[in-house]
């Protein structure tokens, strides 16, 4: 009986943890990821753009490139505290199907890391893509930075923050797309 009670308590704890970690949009992204056709692109996973564990990106190379060979660099949301590139497979897959090459990146998370670590990671990923464009068979001449929520903040910050003055790829960025991000920010301190 004691063992049964302990097993029930463990199951309750597991269920509570699952409930706390579940986000409704996770279900939607998993569904969309599953339904996206996979025959119009090639995917390379977990490419290391830096030395930190989360300095990884997935690269989706289209099989039907647009004339300008645009590259979308997508940054996930998650309040800088959670989120993962795998939550946004559908972004990479959908845009690759439409003729874009797409890099979907992970970045270091809070609270272990604070601003500007997230933005620095994005700058480092862009640098990696530029330095390895021949090996990766991509063009970085026409980049589009795109992010959701915290990721939208990161893409704006890599171009417009005071720290961005050392960012040498601004001329290659042809568009910035922010999805539900915080856009009014003051870089004080």
Where does each model-flagged region fall?
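Short amphipathic alpha-helix adjacent to the substrate-entry channel of hydrolases
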Residues: 86-103
